[in-house]
Design a protein with these regions (language model features):
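Transmembrane helical core of 7TM receptor-like proteins
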Residues: 1-329
Length: 329
């Protein structure tokens, strides 16, 4: 097997085995919280929908990249190609949009309690799911054109303005439609990334102010609530940083490719890997920075391993909860 194909297969395989269990774990745990506690915090609603969008990205793009890397060809027919490309476009845009919404929501939560900010806090928190639904409907309508331009790969000659997407082609036919599409993608990403960065800058500034003002009072109820909010803020900053890094690498390669008279197909594969990585890597950050998910994962691991240890070593273990954290005695 060609070393490059082997490396590509390993890379996309790792994204699949990390991304699917990670996103599924987030979705299942928050659904259980909703069923048991009858409510779900707005931030957790946003995280659930982000994990759902990430999962769709994996199923509509990363898995097919893996199958192509191991040598499987001609898997999709015409209608399946249209569905796959449409799903990928919408879900990837949803992933970016929801991450931007998450950073803006956290920024609003940390804003001063003025009349305007208090109104925004109330409305955004109460209507987080509605905002996501509106975003989804908007993106579905915006990307409906992909159904018309997407086709199963054929042996016939296509136009020079065709994107070759694994088993499918997206033929824009004219230079104008090709450049308009590329410009739209770039502007969309720039706007959302700018919102993420501005929100994160404000969050970082607020965190620094918080560190100076609340030292020594974390034991109070207000301090505990504030501490939870700022821990959530750090998680948002990490997610934004991850996306901005991947976005920067992807677009740096894209700008470089524009300067070349001939673009090696392998470079486009690397760009696909970078743009898809967020869907698989972001669940790791969400789980390790969310206390509820992190404690549940620890408890599940302890529950699975303790009986075996008890049998082998003749020891008795018990799991108890103290201060809302799982501990092993």
């Amino acid at each position: 097997m060609d070393p490059y194909l082997l490396l590509k297969a390993i890379g996309f395989f790792l994204l699949v085995i990390i991304g699917i269990p990670g996103n599924m774990f987030i979705i299942i745990q928050f659904v259980l919280v909703k069923i048991i506690e009858k409510k779900l915090l707005p931030t957790n609603i946003i995280l659930t929908m982000l994990a759902t969008a990430n999962l769709l990205v994996i199923f509509s793009r990363i898995i097919f990249q893996l199958l192509n890397a191991i040598g499987l060809e001609d898997l999709l027919d015409e209608s399946e190609c249209k569905f796959m490309i449409f799903t990928y476009r919408v879900s990837r845009a949803m992933s970016i949009g929801i991450t931007s919404l998450l950073s803006c929501h956290q920024c609003i939560l940390l804003a001063p309690s003025t009349k305007v900010w208090s109104y925004l806090k109330q409305k955004v928190s109460q209507n987080a799911m509605t905002i996501i639904i509106i975003l989804c409907v908007l993106l579905i309508s915006m990307y409906s054109y992909t159904i018309l331009i997407s086709h199963a790969r054929k042996n016939t000659t296509s136009s020079p303005y065709t994107l070759h997407l694994i088993y499918c082609d997206a033929d824009f036919v004219t230079y104008t439609s090709y450049t308009v599409n590329g410009t739209f993608y770039l502007l969309r990403d720039l706007i959302l990334v700018t919102l993420m960065i501005l929100s994160s800058i404000y969050i970082v500034y607020t965190l620094l102010q918080h560190e100076r003002n609340v030292r020594g009072i974390r034991s109070s109820d207000r301090g505990q609530k504030s501490s939870a909010e700022y821990k959530a803020s750090r998680a948002v900053i990490l997610l934004v940083a991850l996306y901005v890094i991947l976005f920067g690498l992807d677009n740096s390669m894209w700008v470089y490719m524009l300067t070349l008279s001939y673009v090696n197909p392998n470079m486009n594969e690397i760009r696909v890997f970078l743009t898809s990585s967020y869907a698989s890597l972001s669940p790791i950050l969400i789980i390790i920075t969310n206390p509820k998910l992190k404690n549940k994962l620890k408890y599940s691991y302890a529950k699975k391993t303790l009986p075996k240890n008890a049998t082998n070593n003749g020891l008795v273990f018990s799991i108890s909860k103290s201060d809302n954290k799982d501990t092993i005695r």
